[in-house]
């Protein structure tokens, strides 16, 4: 009882600390945006937003910092607050940018007239499923997201569909084309308008070795690592679990930034598997074997070779050079340029999707686009180019946090101007002091709770900050904590091995998520009720409910079950199922909630 009361007190302190900072954004009638951020103890606050850059905010007597910027064109823009030199997300913005590194919130400015391509409209919507699959080439488990068209699950439907493998950029997770690129809504809208064909879209993770405890021996990251996983592991998984058409005429591959490079490299070296190639703000190698020196053969295998880039993109010079290279080799390609979307941005990525979705798996439209293609724009000598210096500026030497070892887990935060940095977790009664080194990096090593999964953040001079080096964010309603998920956790995907995995189906508009087992007929329905600060994703992103069920089922310790965050869910009529309910609010921390779920699964 004492331990429970202690844990409850910690949870109350932890949650209370997340609620003090308040902010909101207001879209004004003239198209300007007013940003607000409450932090009475901050010395300096700036707002950094894609359409206006970094700008100072003014502090009011009530401790609310404000700035009005713009006007800005209707679209979605990443932004953050810079508090005393440290970037923080807007604690009251529900939308965020899922990224390995930087932490940004998302500002959505609606159209004043008409609508935007990515708007959520009253049209039939496809399904979004999160999957895990064991990759023999990586020797570990990888992630992907699968979009299924609106008709896929219609009763009696046995139709097979073409597949588009769509890859996000450097430091992006597999979620970015879903949560930032809004590819599902763009495609839903185009299909409803009769402007695109129904298709399956697979969103791979472009940096798969990051998911593993250590990179397999002899494996450095490169196109071959990603391509081997996609062609040798992900594609076979998709084609054995979904109704796909498995030939080159019905496969497409493409992506944004690094994903465009990976997509072109993989596609051009596997023209027996892909005939639609799309590059958004990118380019690829000009030395790929057996591709460029036999134009007639290469052209005969490609329905669509589509290249898009902004003239204000830092990759424009290199991308333009690649377009010109293709022209000189006689390789046909469609070229698209933008001039008003702030360069290397997801505004461009969304726009390029609206241009290419109507052409995919439509040979007539693709051929017309290829025939109407124009030569690359003539070089002016003033183009931005992707140089080692640009690379170093955009991707500085990373801070590793959290870093796991046999003796503990080390957390690090670079904040050279901070006076005090502390580690705050849901498992400790008080924040823990961190020590600063000569380079301004603060650190602390924990030797307890090494196998737990828990939420944490840093307190930088009293301001809550998510770990900028940790890609795993808790999808909380307010401030979004980081997640510490050690490979020694018994349900860690990184060390789970080759077992069957179920899938998690999200409907974020309806506010539900559902896990379906990989095999067997479910005999148990467990309703996972979210806590007051949780979202429909929390039981799976932090609670690891799907991973727990997968492993116990693979070990024969649990029966096939359905896990749902719909608190009103009922068993399917005519099917005998036990119905159980697990409330997050009944437990003081995520380790306790995970243990309760494990116990419930073992009992049933």
PLM regions and their residue ranges:
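Positively charged n-region of N-terminal signal peptides that target proteins for export
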Residues: 1-4
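A short hydrophobic/aromatic micro-motif that marks alpha-helical segments and, especially, helix-coil
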Residues: 17-18, 274
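Boundary at the C-terminal end of the N-terminal hydrophobic targeting segment
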Residues: 19-23
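Non-catalytic cap/lid and distal C-terminal segments of serine-dependent acyl enzymes
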Residues: 27-54, 59-382, 386, 393, ...
